[in-house]
Amino acid sequence: MVFASVPEGDFVWTRGADRVRRFKSSSFGHREYCGDCGTPFSMKVDHQPETVDFSVATLDDPERVAPGFHIFDVSRIPWFETKDALPRHARFRKDTRGLEGTPPD
């Protein structure tokens, strides 16, 4: 699943906002999803309240967003291999929003 990050003030639901549901997915954040079908939409982490991570697949034109790296490569299903030359990180990038390679406890 491809995610992109934007400042919270730039994130706007253009339709279907009444169908969005939220749940606490970890000790450090929550996720939003479609209440009708369960499609994952976005996530927010408590230590970065000014940022929203959202699924690129939810965009009307997802091809306008190009990936810059892969995270959690150690969890990749062995038969799924991409042929790009993008950097791969076992977990988070070390500079991912100050997480230093792992989310806080």
Protein language model features and the residues they cover:
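A short Gly-Trp-Pro
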Residues: M1-D105
